[in-house]
Amino acid sequence: MIRKYIIGVVALLATLVLPALAIDHKGITSDQLDKNSFTLMQNGKPTPILMDVTDERGISIAVENLAEDFRRVGGTRAEVLATPRVSRFVLIGSLQSRYIRQLIKDQKLDVSILKGKSEQYLITTVNRPFANVDEVLVVVGSDRRGAIYGTYELSEQIGVSPWYWWADVPVVRQQNLAIERGNYTAGEPAVKYRGLFLN
């Protein structure tokens, strides 16, 4: 009896919380690789991910999860880089990341939409961001949580639901994935703390 009650409560909470965890930007990823998109994965091989190792610890955990999510989708784990040593990659960080700060200083990344904001992120592309680098997909957060939310938004975009562990939501397997170039953001939360709390 108690078990049925607990299952019922969790199911009710799921119906209330799932909309809050829904993907922010529908229809911006596809399996078509073309000049209007940034390639995230080709023939099962994901684009590497770069982060500043001195950035917030929580961001590095989200990055590792994203790298593993690429394995769930295409079969190969994304390489996590500490330095920009390849020509194309995904760059993830907060406004405190040295790589993000360098892009801002060089006027290659406009983060004005994030200034003074809480838990907000921006996903965009930058051409020729660093020496010997052609293009990067940037996931930048106004703070630690913003960067983390942006990272998990990217996980959703590649086909891994935030309910993968909770509700056995199946992963959509792909060999090719690209994200349409553009500026994607999500606003500040309507409440101070967001998430699923079970007491």
Predicted regions and their residues:
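Acidic, contiguous N-terminal accessory segments
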Residues: 2, 12-13, 18-128, 181-184
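Feature activates predominantly on carbohydrate-active enzymes
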Residues: 62-65, 69-71, 107-199
